[in-house]
Amino acid sequence: MSSGEPLSETSSSSSSFVPVDQVHLQDAIQVIDENKHFNKDILGYINKTCPPNIGHNYHIVAVFGSQSTGKSTLLNRLFNTNFDVMNEQSRQQTTKGIWLAQSPVLSTSHGHGASKSSILVMDVEGTDGRERGEDQDFERKAALFALSTSEVLILNIWETQVGLYQGANMGLLKTVFEVNLTLFGKSKLESKNNLQSKSSHKVLLLVVIRDHVGNTPVENLASTITIDLKKMWDSLLKPTELKELAFEDFFDLDFHALNHKILQPKEFTAGVGRLGDRLVVENDIFKPEYHHNIPIDGWTLYAEKCWEQIETNKDLDLPTQQILVAQFKCDEVVDTVFKEFSNKFKELFAVIEESPDYENVGALFSDLKSEVLEDYDQVAAKYNQSVYLQKRQKLDDLVNTKLKEVFDVHAKNLLQHSLTKYKKDLVALKGKDFAARSKSLSDEALELVMLNLSHISLSGAFATEILLHQFASDIKAITSQQQFIELNNIVSKAVKKLSQSLSKLMQLQLNDPTEKTWDNILYNFHQLQKEFTSKHNGDFGLNTTEAENENAFAKFKFQSWDAFYQLIHKLITKEKVLQQLQTRFDDKFRYDVNGLPKLYQNSRELEESFAVAKEHALGVLPILTIAKLSDDSEIIPDVDIFTKLLRVKYSASNRVGNYNEEGGEEEEDEDEDEDDDVALNGFADIIDEVEKAEIMAKFRKEIDAKFMETKRSIVQHVTQIPYYIYIIILLLGWNEFMAVVRNPFTFSLAIILGASLYILYTMNLLKPALTVTQRLVDEVIAVGKEKLREVLIDDHHIQAHNLDKMTGKVKVGIHEENAKEDEDATDFLKPKPTQVDVTSLNVVEEE
């Protein structure tokens, strides 16, 4: 397109924005119009004109200079863009605002050359135009915008303007440099002081000297411009903290001269080609420190924010706008990848297993986190490193927070299951080698929990110290609880064993009490106590403390004395004492020293034996009613078993330490009255005086009855038939006796009967035979009574019928009335109380 042809809708003189879908690849787009409005559709233009996914692979070039000095022409010739240029005949402003175009190719000395990176060129409205007159506000803002957003700022001046102040735009540049120093100075100072900082961003001021005749060497012109710029920089009003910053900290200078475009067209074209050659060469003009280090989509946002800050005159540090761009883009990436992660998280952890393979869970955690961070890195790593790392940490925290929800559930289940298993294994020890094996179990449980927590803690991302500390505390509490239970079991078993052994000894001693009975019982009791203490020798093998061991021995002593007390009152009661008195009385009263039954011949012998037996029986009553030793001293325990405080502390109901037991205190309260009653009696008191009086009364009643019974038997023995009477009967009945003996039938019957009795006796069947005989006799008597009852019923019809039955005169064919009467008569045959009628009895006898 020639300079004389109109640009139609793509003309840079148009103040309205051009839609992206109507722009050709060579056309430009207006970034900022003359009304200072920023075009938000720049990114769409770049995406259509530049190669896809250029990322950081781009450069921004801007041009600055007076109006109608050929800025647009230079850009079009050098970068092959299509910016509107001035009409030779009108000499008026053509570029309004700021325009942007993508350079398809570069003009070089060898024709057209392509740069390795995409080049975007900004054509800035010229300064000192008659259209704006003295209004330099837009000029300053446009210059500052170009300086802030570009890598290379082309200062387009004529050779005749070198050395001038206003003509070379030195006044405008001074204002721009002051604002630039104010805005960029703080970050530049920080990066300069921070030796580790990689931020050393600069802007290349490429001074293009136009219409160079050649009389003055370019080096001299460059020296003049350099001196003027540095002098101007030194004259800037710098804040105190920024005075040490030099011109070189912000800018690099480079120079290139071009001949007159019209008078020397070939030389002009050759000069443009030489400049293009430098642009093609890597790291010649486009050096890494000039790049803004943000991707192209971030640069568009950065440019928009820069213009917003410049337009509103907000005194902010513009490099933070780069950070804002990075923050905005990185936040977008974070939201995207975290949303994908959340969806996958819901699918994987919709249902959480109670006992999973924690190593697999930990690997799944790591894979999920690595995947989401890799997705973030692929997109966000091209932005500002500090922001990228900051947002990466934010994403890391979000992922950790989400995964920690699952971690907390797994950790809770792990601790609960581990505690349950540990408690079960601990109980299964049943006290065997408890100290060593419980230590081994606790170490094993802690090691396993620590290992599993490390698997799912994302390499320490989730704190496990508190969980491990709590688990260790719970293990210690369970161990202490089981130690207490095992300790109480040992004490309880020892008390039970003592009680069983002591019970047998006491029963043996109390069967035949003597003055030494309680001495022997107490001695054996102490021996059983010593057996327990010597067996454990101050330690129970449970790894318990010395205080706990002492408390266990004290509990054993208390409970053993309490068991002793309970045994005394179990084995010695009113009924048992009365029974023993009766037994001892019977042993003396009914049997002699050889154990044979006594047969008393007279009352005197009976009375003497009765007195001796009674004295023998009552002799043990003092021994059984109070626990006294042979020295007449009562048995007193080493510990007061009747004190309420000790009974609550050492009682059997407290043997398990009240762990998770309800109602323990209420049970103790219910037994308070009983404890009061026990405390009133004392240990040695077994049977009080009231009970003793009851025993004596019952005993006297029983022995008096036995005395009277025995005395009656003596009287019967005295009044019985004399023995000589039997001799007289034998002599007088001798003939009859011999007649029976001589009769073969009776003699044989007697022999058979005697032999049968002998056989039954030898086979121990005599008693069963007598029982059978007795039942047979009873049955015969019952049948006889029944027959007699039938005869004695007071009814002549029934009597006649019964008599006919007895004589066999009842005929088969009988009248229906007689049959009915017989049915009625059967009701009277049922057993019922009936008085015997003497008249009917006489009738029966007469018949």
UniProtKB/Swiss-Prot annotation:
GO terms for cellular component: cortical endoplasmic reticulum; endoplasmic reticulum membrane. It is an enzyme of class 3 (hydrolase). Residues 55-290 form the GB1/RHD3-type G domain. It is a multi-pass membrane protein. Keywords: Endoplasmic reticulum, GTP-binding, Hydrolase, Membrane, Nucleotide-binding, Transmembrane, Transmembrane helix. InterPro entries: G_GB1_RHD3_dom, P-loop_NTPase, RHD3/Sey1, Sey1/RHD3-like_3HB. GTP binds at G65, S66, Q67, S68, T69, G70, K71, S72. Pfam families: RHD3_GTPase (PF05879), Sey1_3HB (PF20428). It is found in: Endoplasmic reticulum membrane. Residues 742-744 are lumenal. GO terms for biological process: endoplasmic reticulum inheritance; endoplasmic reticulum membrane fusion. Its EC number is 3.6.5.-. Its main location: endoplasmic reticulum. Belongs to the TRAFAC class dynamin-like GTPase superfamily. GB1/RHD3 GTPase family. RHD3 subfamily. Cooperates with the reticulon proteins and tubule-shaping DP1 family proteins to generate and maintain the structure of the tubular endoplasmic reticulum network. Has GTPase activity, which is required for its function in ER organization. This is Protein SEY1. It comes from Lodderomyces elongisporus (strain ATCC 11503 / CBS 2605 / JCM 1781 / NBRC 1676 / NRRL YB-4239). The gene is SEY1.
